[in-house]
Amino acid sequence: MNKMLTHLNGYKREAVLAPLFKMLEATFDLFVPLVMADIVNVGIAAHDFHYILVRCGILLLLAVVGLACSLTAQYFSAKAAVGYSTSLRHALFEHIQRLGFTEMDTMGTSTLITRMTSDINQVQSGLNLFLRLFLRSPFVVVGAMIMAFTVNVRAAWIFVVAIPLLSVVVFGVMVITNPLYKTAQARLDRVLGLTRENLTGVRVVRAFDKEKSEIDRFESANDLLTRMQLHVGHISSLMSPLTYVIINLAIVALLYVGSIEINVGGMASGDVIALVNYMNQILVELVKLANLIVQVSKALACAGRVQAVLDTEPGMEFPAALKGEVLTDKAGDAVRFDHVGLTYAGAGAPSLTDISFTAKRGQTIGVIGGTGSGKSSLINLIPRFYDATEGTVEILGRPAQEYPRAALRGSVAVVMQKAQLFGGTIRSNLLWGNKNAADADLWAALETAQAADFVRAKPLGLDEPVEQGGRNLSGGQKQRLTIARALVGKPEILILDDSASALDYATDAALRKALAALPGDLTVFIVSQRAASLQHADQIIVLDDGRMVGLGRHADLLKTCPVYEEIYASQFKKGDAQK
């Protein structure tokens, strides 16, 4: 928890003042029963109206000052809690940005979203309540007991018996429910994960008429969550009736002892009223304390989940700077794989095995294979989204591990299978490639990506709004814009991971021709299911079940690689790929 507590350093003053003002408010509250006892014992008994008015004025003054202290405490506690959660959320988001794909895959997107949102909100609520009540409630409980001794020692012993019994109930419930809240939160993660998966793949679900099975899956997970929450709720609900039973029995005992003391002249009727008021104050504060414990238990469970993310160290280390001279040999290797293997964390079988090839600068490399053959796994090693578990990967003549993150990602641009655009404008999305790019550079990239025509057709051109995820654009438009975004950065290696799947054959061919015509020595990796898209590549890597079963040009592979021949034949058998 040390990492999380450091985010409270900027709010130490507020974190100290909030409980202090609450204690000050509680001090004024403790004097109220004594003033009321005086009104009954002196004012009412003597029919002294002036005395009653003066004491009522004192009660009003205590209420006003107490209210001022309470509002001040609320302000400081809210400022500390909101500021703390804001700082923690920023730190968590920044930490997540440093995590590698392996850590992201292990934890899951839905879990990270939950910890960024509801978990931190729960921590904020718990901290806010804690700062206001963690001193006030115990202070009132102990203070009321001490004040009871100033009224009548014999009656005050009832407080001494009641308070420990109440504490056992309150803390017993806390000990039982705290681990259960963690389990409930884990089940909530499961429900959120299923919801996200269903909404993301809603078209597939409906295409296969799987609505009923998805509903059943969701209901099963939701039922487990509901049962756990009900179980926790049932245990927590015992707190109020048990505490009320103890308090009411204590009040009955108090009235009984009070009646005896009044008969023998040991105390007045106003003193009994004061003692009952003190007992009621204890009841109110213990109910608050019980609620505080429940909220803090939830907050601690959520804080532990947030801390687990913060404790997760990135699996990849990037050097701060590139050591030695940058290689400028234009005839050298752009990418070299030497007996590379890759096994994902938690996977039983390797995704890639013994992959070796060399891509020269300026070459176009095709990657093809069946579903699950390891195409995306292979190209993910080039920008170092994952580290090879066997062998070495060299980029531009150096091991990938020697590059700083910015230098490597600046040299290697990746266009993913799923085109991802961000809310803003076409211009703001393109500037992700190079924030200092001029309009001429943006249009040049759009021309190469075959996107210039439809962007010009937009009323605002480059400043045309883009909705979150590019919802207002077609699949082909999104793919072309993501390719243009990659080209704006003028990388030395461009990876197109099946990123032209939504393009027609004519546009796909025009794109490949435009890429080949780019000046310089751009090395292009094209991952595609279409053999036609790779026919003119300098080399084609053929993968099957994580192994490289073919390497060469199109014509050679048709003669030497049965897997490639089968893929090609399946697409051209009916001639639909060329018509």
Where are these regions (language model features)?
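Pre-NBD coupling/linker segments of ABC/ABC-like ATPases
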Residues: 314-330
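Transmembrane helices of ABC transporter permease
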Residues: 10, 14-27, 38, 62, ...
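An intracellular "coupling" helix at the cytosolic face of ABC transporter transmembrane type-1 domains
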Residues: 10-13, 98-102, 118-131, 135, ...
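ABC-type nucleotide-binding domain
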Residues: 326-579
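Membrane-integrated ABC transporters
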Residues: 1-31, 36, 44-60, 65, ...
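Helix-loop-helix
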Residues: 47-54, 147-161, 231-305, 309-310
